Amino acid sequence: MTKDVVVEHGESSKAPLVAAPAASGVGRAASVADVFLRFLAIVGTIASAISMGTTNETLPFFTQFIQFEAKYSDLPSFTFFVAANAVVCTYLVLSIPLSIVHIVRPRARYSRLVLVFFDAAMLTLLTAGASAAAAIVYLAHKGNVRANWFAICQQFDSFCERISGSLIGSFAAMVLLIMLIFLSAFALARRH
């Protein structure tokens, strides 16, 4: 009777190989949840980028010859917001195949570490973009009397509704990225 021996990578043995135990259902469920959360975050970031990127409003002033226009591209914070959401959305789309690999191979450790690292980097970028835009949205709604910055939302109501609404998808994507990081950390911790 021969004794079964597990052979690790780089070792040789004449003993028969023993297959690693099948992945548990919990690891596979976590990987499926990972893919689902990535799709939701893609929807949030692309909706925010499109909503902010297509925002503009023109108001006539006494005559048709003089008009005031509010566009997202007039403010660098909004431009950064659109760029940050576009970069994060692109990353999320590109990370889907790697996330799908985790459904097939739930024990893949290094690829999960890569995802945790880049998820954290994208969370940082998205937080910076959303925070910059949120500060300007607040000024658009409330103004700053001490700096003589007047609120513009009484005049540009459609513009303000769009820029405020675009923040929702971005903040939702931030929460989803936090959940993705915790999910990956949980999957990595289960192996030790």
Swiss-Prot record:
It is a multi-pass membrane protein. Residues 1-31, 101-112, 188-192 are cytoplasmic. It holds the Pfam family CASP_dom. Residues 53-79, 134-166 are extracellular. The keyword GTP-binding does not apply. Keywords: Cell membrane, Cell wall biogenesis/degradation, Glycoprotein, Membrane, Transmembrane, Transmembrane helix. Coiled coil: none annotated. The chain crosses the membrane at residues 32-52, 80-100, 113-133, 167-187. GO terms for biological process: cell wall organization. Its main location: membrane. Glycans are attached at N56. It is found in: Cell membrane. InterPro entries: CASP/CASPL, CASP_dom, CASPL. One of its GO terms (cellular component) is plasma membrane. NCBIfam families: A_tha_TIGR01569. Regulates membrane-cell wall junctions and localized cell wall deposition. Required for establishment of the Casparian strip membrane domain (CSD) and the subsequent formation of Casparian strips, a cell wall modification of the root endodermis that determines an apoplastic barrier between the intraorganismal apoplasm and the extraorganismal apoplasm and prevents lateral diffusion. Belongs to the Casparian strip membrane proteins (CASP) family. Homodimer and heterodimers. This is Casparian strip membrane protein 2. It comes from Panicum virgatum (Blackwell switchgrass). The lineage of its organism: Eukaryota, Viridiplantae, Streptophyta, Embryophyta, Tracheophyta.
